[in-house]
Design a protein with these regions (language model features):
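Sec/Tat signal peptide C-region and signal peptidase I cleavage site
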Residues: 9-15
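Short beta-strand->loop
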Residues: 88-99, 150, 246-262, 271-274
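Mature extracytoplasmic/periplasmic domains
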Residues: 266, 271-332
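Ligand-binding pocket segment of bilobal, Venus flytrap-like solute-binding proteins
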Residues: 160, 167-255
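Conserved C-terminal helix/tail region of periplasmic/extracytoplasmic solute-binding proteins
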Residues: 219, 327-358
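Ligand-binding "clamshell"
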Residues: 82-90, 107-109, 114-116, 208, ...
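Early extracytoplasmic/lumenal segment of secretory-pathway proteins
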Residues: 16-81
Length: 358
């Protein structure tokens, strides 16, 4: 009996000493080796789950007791969530690598998180057009190019790609602002009349869109199952890389339209009710190491907010203007702010109608 009790106490002690961090991140958004190396170095086990829509993350956060210690919200959702009180302030004394952040990116992020108190940038990117080069040339001619939103938002143009498969992000917060911008309206407009104009435009092109999804297009584009997508820069670049690795003859390219596109920021935050706060800070700090940030960018093909990492980033990635846009392109990028709840509900209803036709 004494031996059993002693064994039980020992088991409990081991369980209590086991360290873990529960992470909720976007799909295809980290080098798995980074997780392995973090655990090997720190002894902290990483429980890693993924999502492919900000709404999924937000639902869990607002409900409380999400069970996660580190999450990765996009900035315009972060802004609203900070106001809702779902995050705790970062303990910057535990983030020794915070000095590696890119000041310009931190400044842009501060628009959503004043003082950068609740988040630090993980990755950033753009929302543009990914396409199959062969399919594009077959439809637009040997000298054809995709460099304008005209190809998406003019129904007669998008219809040319209907037969080979068009996908679009299932994200009203990406697609509606793009439609507003194309119409010459403020991409951040909450005016119902503006939003209805954007919805009318999207309803006109809806017949040519095979599917709305925020992650399936990565593999579908690489496999040649679809030929055009409005998607996120890094995902399309990953698709390009996978097609090359598969040697399947599919050539993928990515365009940031000349009219401009959305620039987004995905960020590391710690929920207020996180159970493993020290481990969460340790994980965030590890991701802020220059060589670690570079390893992630090299694999996922997204730019990161870590200036010190650039000397470790593959030249092909750093020189790719679809990943790290040049200054002229950066000047044409716009950002999206959080909508108030009433406007967000209105946009969500419009989005459902656009997708379903009802």
């Amino acid at each position: 009996m004494v031996m059993f009790a002693t064994g039980l106490l020992a088991t409990q002690a081991v369980a209590q000493s086991a360290r873990v961090v529960n992470v909720y991140n976007w799909s295809d958004y980290i080098d798995p080796k980074v997780i392995e190396d973090f655990t090997s170095e720190t002894g902290i086990k990483v429980q890693y789950d993924t999502f492919d829509a900000n709404e999924t993350l937000e639902t869990k956060l607002l409900a409380g007791k999400s069970g996660y210690d580190v999450v990765v919200p996009t900035a315009y959702f972060l802004e609203r969530q900070v106001k809702a009180g779902v995050f705790q302030k970062l303990d910057k004394s535990k983030l020794k690598n915070l000095g590696n952040v890119w000041p310009d990116i931190a400044k842009r992020l501060a628009v959503y998180d004043p003082g950068n108190q609740y988040a630090v940038n993980y990755m950033w990117g753009t929302t543009g057009i990914g396409y199959n080069v062969k399919a594009m040339r077959e439809r637009l001619g040997p000298t054809g190019t995709i460099d304008s939103w005209d190809i998406v938002f003019k129904p007669e143009n998008l219809a040319k790609f209907r037969d080979c498969g068009v996908h679009m992000l299932d994200s009203a917060d990406d697609i509606v602002p793009a439609a507003l911008h194309f119409l010459g309206l403020n991409p951040n407009s909450n005016d119902p009349k503006d939003l209805e104009k954007a919805a009318e435009l999207l309803e006109k092109i809806r017949p040519s869109v095979r599917k709305f999804h925020s992650s399936e297009y990565l593999n579908a584009l690489a496999a040649g199952e679809i030929c055009l997508v409005v998607g996120w820069s890094g995902d399309i670049k990953q698709s390009q890389k996978r097609a090359l690795e598969a040697k399947n003859g599919v050539e993928i390219d990515y365009s940031i339209p000349k009219e401009g596109a959305q620039m987004f920021f995905d960020n590391l935050s710690i929920p207020k009710d996180a159970s493993h706060v020290d481990e969460a800070h340790a994980f965030v700090d590890y991701l802020l190491r220059p060589e670690v940030a570079a390893k992630n960018s090299n694999l996922v093909a997204y730019a990161n907010g870590n200036l010190a990492s650039q000397k470790f980033i593959d030249k092909a990635v750093l020189d790719d203007k679809g990943i790290y846009p040049d200054a002229a392109t950066m000047d044409r990028l716009y950002t999206v702010s959080a909508r108030d709840q009433k406007s967000q509900r209105f946009v969500n209803r419009l989005w459902t109608k656009i997708k379903t036709g009802r």
